[in-house]
């Protein structure tokens, strides 16, 4: 049996852009994404602290420092400056659960790393 468990999280990131006319996804500063163990194309859940919206999308690695940009139709669910939590989950069996520690990255309002 497997369980969906928290794999990693970027906590309280700030939306820097929302691009309605892009195909879809969330663009995340590559360094920040790698620290959170997020891979390009990985499914993530976005929770907007300001308005309560929750939605799923996939990761695109961005080149700009501190970039967190929601793309496509989901851009209507956020506003620039909103605070979000970016969550990734993984299916794990009992042994994997016991050995796993989620990667949690805390950032400030400029999406600079506070703590890992």
Swiss-Prot record:
Instruction: Extract the CDD domains matched here.
Output: Asp_decarbox
Known EC number: 4.1.1.11
Cofactors needed by this protein, per the record, are:
pyruvate
Keyword NADP among record annotations = no
Q: Which GO terms describe its cellular component?
A: cytosol
> Per UniProt, what is one GO molecular function of this protein?
aspartate 1-decarboxylase activity
Pathway(s) where this gene product acts: Cofactor biosynthesis; (R)-pantothenate biosynthesis; beta-alanine from L-aspartate: step 1/1
Where do the annotations place substrate binding?
Answer: 57, 72-74
In this UniProt entry, the residues modified to Pyruvic acid (Ser) are: 25
Active site at 25 (schiff-base intermediate with substrate), 58 (proton donor)
Subcellular location field: Cytoplasm
Q: How would you summarize the oligomeric state and partners of this protein?
A: Heterooctamer of four alpha and four beta subunits.
Q: This protein is called what?
A: Aspartate 1-decarboxylase
Q: What is the lineage of its organism?
A: Bacteria, Pseudomonadati, Campylobacterota, Epsilonproteobacteria, Campylobacterales
Gene transcribed to yield this protein: panD
């Amino acid at each position: 049996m497997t369980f969906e468990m928290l794999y990693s999280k970027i906590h309280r990131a700030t939306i820097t852009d929302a691009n309605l006319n892009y195909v879809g996804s969330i663009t995340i500063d590559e360094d920040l994404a790698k620290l959170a163990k997020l891979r390009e194309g990985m499914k993530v859940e976005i929770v907007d602290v300001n308005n309560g919206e929750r939605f799923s999308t996939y990761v695109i690695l961005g080149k700009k420092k501190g970039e967190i940009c929601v793309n496509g139709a989901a851009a209507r669910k956020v506003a620039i400056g909103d605070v979000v939590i970016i969550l990734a989950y993984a299916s794990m069996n009992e042994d994997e659960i016991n050995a796993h520690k989620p990667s949690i990255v805390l950032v400030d309002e400029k999406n600079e790393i506070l703590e890992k």
